[in-house]
């Protein structure tokens, strides 16, 4: 009971708002399956909403997919508005972030659970959203934000969604004009992403049994669809 209460207290509004937006009238919420509580139970489908940190679900997903169909729902911010507040909740500034989220950003999280791609009972749905992020300069946040803390994340709008029902669906990530044998650098160039993101993608697809390593292409690793 205490664990459930702490979970609720630590959740951003985004988590509960996604659950509400994603749910159907017949869904059940916060249902116990074995030793776990799942966000939504839709018939025989257990649904987990995770806004970040896929690694926190690793054990839960591995265990539940042995007996149940499990879907992970991930809200990916396409557009973000950043609201800066003072300690008294006064709004100091509000601006639109110049960064626009892309589907390939998913793999920054998926690298934590890449093996799940090849699990038959596992599916993943990405929701492309607009969100508001509320920040407070309290010196307790990430060094990347110079100590600014994220105090709240709010759902503004669900724009679109894409479902990865099986491992083969992940091939849609790869550009159509990619060579039969390709490198991370070639993938990065065609997809207009960083080499680091390309490496995350090929790592996940290899672990999920979607592509394989076929040796070297020049000095770089060469990959091929299975």
Residue ranges of model-derived segments:
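Short acidic, hydrophobic short linear motifs in intrinsically disordered regions
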Residues: 178-191
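Short amphipathic alpha-helical interaction segments
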Residues: 193-206
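Long, low-complexity, charged/polar intrinsically disordered regions in eukaryotic proteins
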Residues: 94-165
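A short, conserved structural fragment
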Residues: 206-217
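Short, cationic-aromatic polyanion-contact patches
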Residues: 216-226
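Long, charge-dense
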Residues: 69-113
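Acidic-basic catalytic patches of nuclease active cores, encompassing PD-(D/E)XK
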Residues: 1-37
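Conserved catalytic cores of phosphodiester-cleaving nucleases, focusing on short active-site segments
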Residues: 38-53, 57, 64
